[in-house]
């Protein structure tokens, strides 16, 4: 069963559906005939005079319970957004419970003393809106939006989830499971790995630098969630922002009514370790074997939220990496063709923020791209940008600002962010004017003060066997794995596990699966195994097919040696969104040849294959097809090197028995081993029966909501 290929195609389909829709619309527009004599301007029109940005006036107040309140009357749309922010973010969580704030935020809308999770969702949807809660480093926020005429209903629900959440035990378990799945996805995604490593390296043991782990998530109990809620979800010091088609008088009266009886002050934040003071630049290499690209994230601590340097730094960031017309993008992509994009940004939490420059580059140019990024940082520090470059950045930022405060939700977010950071009342209304007033001298002084390359944290996620040498030429390199554990250079070429295949478990049969996307049947997949002969050799032939709603069709045949289970042939064909895809691979010992033509988000990969692999390397599709032949047992773990023809790389795939599960699918109920396969483009969980006949009852992508469920088996 070619499950890896099926999952790859399913994931590409879910992600690409919107992209194909946009492409179709674009093509339809392009086919509209134009007049024969149509003339197109050769120069952009001159800029019109800048119109003043009219920020709506707002009213401040304080409720009897100590909630600070800001009301912004904005009557352009008949909607309203209400945000309640409380000092209850990650900074308030003990290190051994990292992730607790996110679970509490997730659970606030999952049940109260008078409403179930479904009732909360239905009531808010009935008001023409939505409700959500999330946490960041410093704050926990609950936001509800609705039609303005339904503000009372929305406010009552908001107050209920804040004041009367019950944290049902089943919901706690589900939230923890979702967080563990999210962690699995993070540990498989280079961008997320870079962000996790960067935060830890910059902030150290400070709460801003902590990453939740499997251990901290599993340690979180319902009692922990309830205790955190009771200690920190309190009115005194909270901020309520209401923006939309409302009157201040109505909002004040309603807020006092719905929050009546809410009392208390939150527990203070625990003492936190100091942020490390960096004295030199270090490169941290996060080894991801088989990666075809490298993710670079470089930066340093920068400013606190009330530093007036925010205005020149906003302009400097726009010049350096704030868009497709910025230096990093133009040089690394347009001039060098090293990446699809390179950008920069800086953060402003309640404490110390950071500057970050990032790019995802081709593996062979990793060191060159990093060197160029550092050169551009030095250039910005040592050479004040030209007047024309400054003017272009200012014009964009000043002209774009009104677009960021158009809707009630945008206004509420902007006002809340400013107030929570302790910024003055005129910060948002006058932000644009202060940007426009920045002088060239102020910009140069800020660049000289903040931008540096001699005290940086540089994180590179990529295949250490291919990029370590180049990185060493740029500076000191420390190697870690995906979880941040130290690695030695010798660890970059870990030896695969010797697998004692139980070939007798591979019995000829046919299987049918339904493909579920977000709980809805979207298509069908089939697979079959048969014994055959090729000359004097006995082989196993595994065929599979998949159809996803007519958007994707795929057929695969994998042939392996019946005695050794070594790969012999792979044939894959089909189409995705109208694009043909095919893969032909032939294995002769350690030598593989063939051709691939596979659509991807970066375009079509069309390439000949002619490469020599290490002894014992499997085809990744063979590995997934043969999982039922592993001698599965609690805690069992294997690592094999597998060739991925889609990308043309060898990746170490791991299969780990992570537990037991009872699985009910249309074909019946089965007692299964849960086997987590990682190391590919994304993690996959397989549910394999514990007793004969050994089969895959279900398999699922971790992250994207795609599940394959067994519906029938013959014989």
PLM-predicted stretches and their roles:
Residues 36-122, 143-146, 156-157, 226-331, ...:
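His/Glu-rich zincin catalytic helix
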Residues 498-589, 634-715:
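Acidic, serine/threonine-rich low-complexity disordered tracts
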Residues 1-16:
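N-terminal secretory signal peptides that target proteins for export/translocation
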Residues 70-72, 76-106, 115-162, 176-180, ...:
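M16 family metallopeptidases and their MPP-like homologs
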Residues 160-167, 258-266, 375-384, 474-482, ...:
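A common structural junction motif
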Residues 19-32:
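Bacterial N-terminal signal peptides
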Residues 371, 375-379, 548-632:
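Contiguous hydrophobic, core-forming segments of folded domains
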């Amino acid at each position: 069963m070619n499950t890896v290929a099926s999952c790859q195609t399913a994931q590409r389909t879910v992600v690409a559906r919107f992209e194909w829709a946009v492409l179709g619309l674009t093509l339809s527009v392009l086919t509209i005939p134009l007049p024969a004599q149509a003339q197109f301007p050769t120069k952009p029109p001159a800029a019109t005079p800048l119109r003043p940005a009219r920020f709506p006036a707002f009213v401040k107040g304080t409720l009897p319970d100590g909630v600070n309140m800001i009301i912004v009357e904005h009557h352009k749309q008949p909607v309203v957004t209400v945000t309640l922010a409380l000092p209850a973010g990650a900074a308030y969580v003990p290190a051994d419970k990292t992730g607790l704030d996110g679970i509490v935020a997730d659970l606030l809308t999952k049940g109260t003393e008078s409403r179930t999770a479904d009732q909360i969702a239905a009531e808010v949807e009935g008001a023409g809106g939505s409700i959500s809660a999330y946490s960041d480093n410093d704050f926990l926020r609950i936001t509800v939006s609705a039609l303005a005429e339904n503000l009372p209903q929305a406010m009552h629900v908001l107050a209920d989830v804040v004041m009367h959440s019950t944290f049902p035990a089943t919901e706690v378990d589900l939230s923890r499971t979702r967080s563990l799945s999210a962690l699995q996805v993070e540990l498989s995604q280079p961008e997320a790995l870079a962000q996790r490593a960067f935060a830890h390296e910059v902030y150290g043991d400070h709460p801003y630098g902590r990453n939740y782990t499997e251990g901290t998530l599993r340690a979180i109990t319902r009692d922990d969630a309830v205790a955190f809620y009771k200690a920190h979800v309190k009115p005194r010091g909270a901020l309520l922002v209401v923006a939309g088609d409302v009157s201040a008088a109505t909002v004040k009266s309603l807020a006092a009514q719905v929050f009546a009886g809410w009392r208390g002050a939150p527990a203070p934040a625990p003492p936190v370790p100091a942020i490390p003071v960096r004295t030199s630049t270090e490169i941290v290499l996060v080894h991801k074997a088989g990666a075809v690209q490298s993710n670079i994230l470089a930066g340093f601590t920068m400013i606190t939220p009330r530093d007036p340097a925010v205005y020149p730094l906003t302009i400097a960031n726009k010049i350096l990496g704030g868009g497709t017309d910025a230096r990093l993008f133009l040089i690394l992509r347009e001039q060098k063709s090293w990446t699809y994009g390179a950008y920069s940004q800086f953060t402003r939490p309640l404490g110390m923020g950071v500057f970050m420059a990032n790019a995802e580059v081709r593996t062979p140019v990793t060191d060159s791209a990093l060197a160029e990024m550092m050169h551009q940082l030095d250039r910005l520090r040592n050479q004040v940008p030209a007047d024309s470059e400054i003017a272009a950045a200012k014009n964009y930022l000043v002209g774009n600002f009104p677009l960021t405060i158009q809707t009630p939700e945008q206004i509420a977010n902007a006002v809340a962010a400013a107030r929570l950071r302790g910024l003055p009342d005129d910060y948002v209304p006058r932000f644009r004017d202060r940007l426009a007033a920045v002088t060239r001298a102020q910009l140069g002084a800020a660049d000289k003060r903040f931008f540096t390359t001699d005290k940086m944290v540089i994180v590179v996620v990529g295949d250490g066997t291919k990029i370590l040498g180049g990185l060493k030429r740029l500076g000191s390199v420390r190697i870690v794995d995906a979880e941040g554990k130290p690695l030695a250079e010798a660890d970059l070429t870990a030896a695969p596990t010797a697998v004692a295949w139980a070939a007798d478990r591979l019995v000829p049969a046919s299987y049918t699966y339904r493909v579920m996307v977000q709980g809805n049947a979207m298509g069908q997949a089939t697979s079959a195994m048969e014994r055959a002969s090729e000359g004097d050799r006995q082989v196993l032939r595994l065929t599979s097919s998949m159809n996803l709603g007519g958007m994707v069709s795929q057929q695969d045949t994998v042939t392996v040696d019946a005695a050794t289970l070594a790969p012999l042939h792979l044939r894959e064909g089909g189409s995705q969104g109208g694009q043909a895809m095919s893969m032909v691979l032939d294995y002769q010992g350690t030598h593989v040849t063939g051709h691939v033509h596979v659509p991807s988000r970066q375009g079509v990969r069309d390439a000949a294959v002619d490469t020599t692999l290490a002894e014992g390397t499997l085809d990744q599709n063979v590995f997934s097809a043969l999982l039922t032949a592993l001698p599965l047992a609690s805690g069992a773990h294997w690592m094999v090197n597998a060739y991925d023809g889609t990308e043309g790389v060898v990746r170490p795939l791991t299969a780990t028995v992570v537990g037991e599960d009872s699985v009910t699918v249309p074909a019946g109920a089965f007692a299964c081993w849960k086997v987590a396969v990682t190391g590919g483009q994304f993690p996959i969980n397989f549910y394999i029966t514990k007793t004969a006949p050994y089969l895959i009852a279900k398999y699922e992508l971790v992250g994207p909501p795609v599940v394959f469920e067994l519906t029938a088996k013959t014989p």
